[in-house]
Amino acid sequence: MSEQGVIGKGTWIDKLSSELIEREKSLGRSLDILRVESGLGASGIPHIGSLGDAVRAYGVKLALENFGYKSELIAYSDDLDGLRKIPEGMQQFNLDEHLAKPVSLIPDPYGCHDSYGMHMSSILLDGLDRVGIKYEFRRAVDTYKQGLLKDQIHTILQNSTKIGEKIAELVGQEKYQKNLPYFPVCVNCSRLYTAESTEYIADERKVKYRCHDVEIGSKIIKGCGHEGEADITKDLGKLAWKVEFAARWSAFDIRFEAYGKDIMDSVKVNDWVSDEILGFPHPHHVKYEMFLDKGGKKISKSLGNVVTSQRW
């Protein structure tokens, strides 16, 4: 009976990292540094599922280093995401007026951080620090303000028709056949999801938009009616999830990112956008299951049925 060699220290993370290295070699990309990423949701209280994503990514980083490669974990806070609903247990803060606004523009209801989004991010960062995870922290609001994704945004918006058709083909979502996959922050009311991009003026790198009522979940969020233009190189706005991962991967040179099965559709589309539109081979992935509560429901920041990393 033939013996098989042990890969690294013999864990599934070693096997995964070995596959990642071989894939990078076959793609002919530089192996000087192999960056891995973990996305941090900032719209509600982070839980052990959020910590688990970062732990997986950090495990891959350590395995890559054990193989002799330099690696870095980027912990990316999606703090430009809009507040879609008020998490359970936070109704006393009267956050209704801030629905659809980026969480980085909402005041911290607890009064200890510069925004609601940074308060939520800090809870998870504290958890990462407590378990000894080393990372480089990046915020979405700074990433967009500094124009780090401006070239990717431009390319994506130039190809919005093609992307909209592909999204419909891959996952059956038709909204981006009509709308651009980009949300400017309305200059009048500071809301994100109410500002619908209607046209991209490529030579000026501006989107035309109108702020109107939208339905989020079962709630109607009122738009202010403003119509205007937003410069993608300097005005605040963000890409839709169906394309934003791809822009980040390309801009930050990400080679690995795990994902939960609840966002499979978004990853499928982003992989295609990364490969075919941005010309950046998508990162190596591993899919994972969700943490469930004792009733069998997925733990959720918005539902409030969470166990934080601190409590764990």
Which residue ranges define each predicted feature?
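Short, surface-exposed, charge-dense and proline/glycine-enriched linear segments
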Residues: 63-68, 100-116, 162-178, 194-210, ...
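Residue-level "edge-of-site" marker
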Residues: 77-79, 141-143, 169, 199, ...
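Extended, charge-enriched helical/coil interaction regions that scaffold DNA-processing
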Residues: 129-132, 145-194, 207-210
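Generic domain-boundary/flexible-linker signal
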Residues: 82-84, 148, 167, 197-200, ...
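N-terminal Rossmann-like or analogous alpha/beta NTP/dinucleotide-binding catalytic cores
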Residues: 1-164, 270-272
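Alpha-helical recognition segments enriched in aromatics with Gly/Pro capping
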Residues: 15, 22-39, 173, 177-312
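Short, surface-exposed, charged/polar-biased interaction segments
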Residues: 85, 92-94, 145, 170-177, ...
